Amino acid sequence: MSEAITSARATARFVRVSPMKARRVIDLVRGKSVEEALAILKYAPQAASEPVAKVVASAAANAENNFGLDRRSLVVSEAFADEGPTMRRFSPRAQGRAFQIRKRTSHITIVVESQKEGAK
């Protein structure tokens, strides 16, 4: 039990962003420091960057408050978006038809790890 905890995670579930679009944004921040990741996400034009930024900030806060890790040494070690449940909606079309619209959701998970100052 002498091993110190060096990682923290945060998850946002049922986010109304398609997993494919969320993964585009997540790929930008994987492996970056938390400060750098938040700076990238702040100016990313994609709509998915806002919920991803919230999860990165939450993971950093979890590391800081729950495990006493230094925010400046945190790196996004793991980041992924899994598919959540799909909401099905119907769009009325001509001549009494109805087409199905799939509104996809994502479960976004970010893991941050404390890295030594000399590493990298």
UniProtKB/Swiss-Prot annotation:
InterPro entries per UniProt: Ribosomal_uL22, Ribosomal_uL22_bac/chlpt-type, Ribosomal_uL22_bac/org-type, Ribosomal_uL22_CS, Ribosomal_uL22_sf
GO biological process: one example: translation
CDD domains named among the record's database cross-references: Ribosomal_L22
UniProt-listed Gene3D superfamilies: Ribosomal protein L22/L17
GO cellular component: cytosolic large ribosomal subunit
Molecular functions per Gene Ontology: rRNA binding; structural constituent of ribosome
Residues annotated as transmembrane: none
Origin superkingdom: Bacteria
Keyword tags: Ribonucleoprotein, Ribosomal protein, RNA-binding, rRNA-binding
Keyword Cell cycle applies: no
Similarity-based family: Belongs to the universal ribosomal protein uL22 family.
Assembly with partners or alone: Part of the 50S ribosomal subunit.
Protein role: This protein binds specifically to 23S rRNA; its binding is stimulated by other ribosomal proteins, e.g. L4, L17, and L20. It is important during the early stages of 50S assembly. It makes multiple contacts with different domains of the 23S rRNA in the assembled 50S subunit and ribosome.
Protein's name in the database: Large ribosomal subunit protein uL22
Source organism (scientific name): Corynebacterium diphtheriae (strain ATCC 700971 / NCTC 13129 / Biotype gravis)
